[in-house]
Amino acid sequence: VWRVTLDRDGAPLLFDTIHPCGCYHQFVPTARLVARPPEPGVEEGALVVQALPALETGARVRLSIASGPHYLQRVDPVAPGAALPSDAEDYRFEHESALRALPLAGGGSASLYGPDGIVAGTERPERYALWISGIESPGAMRQWGRHATAFVGRRHFDDAFLVDRYFARAPK
């Protein structure tokens, strides 16, 4: 999952990503933000894997993703009008709501998600080690809005105050 948080003027402020289970929450702030110092205590802080320079108007970002596990490896700014590499892949976006009404062979439809928001059959072995975190089935793919992103403390991907919690405006 890749998210772009826009500033008041419509320019990118922060990029962040999670695996569809909620794990591996990584932050890539632009030059408009600086990371706040970690709060004292045992809570997981923000994992800032990279900071981007100021982006030109019209610039894009290129995501380098590992082919097997699909982990984010790097984010690079791409100048406006620059050609994409010849090996770049185009992906078609589908609205996530389509996964809640998948057509069945015999007619009707069914949701990809169970009543608990978890995708059946995506359980991973780490759930046995991380059950104590209180997160149901850690490592399993889950529905939007059900992504806990920390095993220590409380943090959710859709927290409205997430940016303010971990970042401050960079001095001008």
Label each region the model flagged.
Residues 2-10:
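A short, surface-exposed beta-strand/turn
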Residues 9-172:
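Domain-length functional cores that host ligand/cofactor binding and catalytic or interaction surfaces
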